[in-house]
């Protein structure tokens, strides 16, 4: 996934959505997910990571080197106090697959769909080309992404 991750980071930083954002929420990758953590080297941006609290996703400010702990879902999460998602200009969302209409397939917990339900700013998925499909069979509660960036 290293080469694909590198391609996706390079494509993302060239988008207007990234260039125009100051506060960016990304995710700490699982071993089989795209690794966008090299973005943290961009000192012109403020970064945030998600944390699960009950059934909700929280937004936490993050700087490279800040303390993280492993969650019950085996993701790395910040230990600092949560902040308002209204601080965030751009959310980069993980996905198992995306379709051409901007829908994503997650892990089934609905955390991102609930978090993004009333989020009016930019939502992006960065994903390997082979995980872009015709349809992910979206459900009523699914939130569309503004942009899908593939490795192709």
What are the language-model segments listed below?
Residues 4, 8, 111-112, 144:
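Internal, well-ordered alpha-helical segments in soluble enzyme and binding-protein domains
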Residues 28-30, 51, 95-96, 127-130, ...:
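Short secondary-structure boundary segments
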Residues 41, 106-111:
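Charged helix-capping and loop-helix junction motifs
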Residues 54, 80, 96-99, 110-111, ...:
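Short acidic/polar capping segments at secondary-structure boundaries
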Residues 86-91, 100-103, 114-152:
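Surface-exposed, charge/polar-rich loops and edge strands
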Residues 1-84:
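N-terminal active-site beta-alpha-beta segment that forms phosphate/nucleotide-binding
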Residues 24, 91-92:
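Receiver (REC) domain switch-region micro-motif
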């Amino acid at each position: 996934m290293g080469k694909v991750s590198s391609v996706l980071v390079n494509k993302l930083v060239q988008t207007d959505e990234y260039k125009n954002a100051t506060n960016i929420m990304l995710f700490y990758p699982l071993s089989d997910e795209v690794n966008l953590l090299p973005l943290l080297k961009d000192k012109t941006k403020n970064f945030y990571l998600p944390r699960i609290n009950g059934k909700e996703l929280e937004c936490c400010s993050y700087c490279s080197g800040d303390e993280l702990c492993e969650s019950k879902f085996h993701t790395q999460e910040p230990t600092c106090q949560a902040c308002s998602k209204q601080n965030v200009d751009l959310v980069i969302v993980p996905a198992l697959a995306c379709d051409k209409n901007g829908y994503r397939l997650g892990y089934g917990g609905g955390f991102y769909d609930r978090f993004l339900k009333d989020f009016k700013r930019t939502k992006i998925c960065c994903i390997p080309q082979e995980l872009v499909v015709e349809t992910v069979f979206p459900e009523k509660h699914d939130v569309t992404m503004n942009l899908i960036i593939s490795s192709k």
